[in-house]
């Protein structure tokens, strides 16, 4: 059964509908590739998928461990090739984790392993460099 239904709307824009929920995503070609850049580009969604997958799988592992994963933040940077063919060459994910006594060194290592082995990370072509970095805030320091 299909997961997504996508229509090309013209002018380098698509609309994708998640069939189970009805949620819609618009994509637009980026300004550096003759588009308007008014929405996520398809390659932006690839980079976004990596970050979202990392957060989701960390949440799943924490839930299995009986831990409520606190709200965290991440920035995602997508780097495109300078030469042809146009492609993603690097995705940088910088994750800031809030202070929590739950995050022992052992648990931090578990979360970092989870991030590096989420389904999207394992599905991306090995030529795409994945730079996944954590900034673990410490309880009582800078909080």
Model-derived features with residue positions:
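Extended beta-strand/beta-hairpin segments
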Residues: 1-48, 59-143
């Amino acid at each position: 059964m299909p997961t997504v239904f996508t229509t090309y709307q013209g002018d380098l824009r698509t609309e994708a509908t998640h069939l189970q929920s009805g949620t819609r995503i618009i994509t637009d070609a980026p300004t550096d590739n003759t588009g308007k850049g008014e929405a996520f580009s398809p390659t932006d969604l690839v980079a976004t998928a990596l970050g979202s997958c990392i957060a989701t799988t960390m949440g799943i592992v924490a839930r299995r461990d009986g831990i409520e994963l606190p709200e965290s933040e991440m920035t995602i940077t997508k780097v495109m090739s300078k030469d042809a063919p146009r492609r993603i060459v690097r995705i940088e994910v910088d994750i800031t984790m809030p202070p929590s006594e739950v995050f022992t060194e052992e648990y931090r290592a578990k979360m970092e392993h989870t991030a590096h082995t989420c389904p999207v990370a394992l599905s991306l072509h090995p030529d795409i460099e994945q730079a996944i970095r954590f900034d673990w805030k410490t309880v009582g320091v800078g909080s």
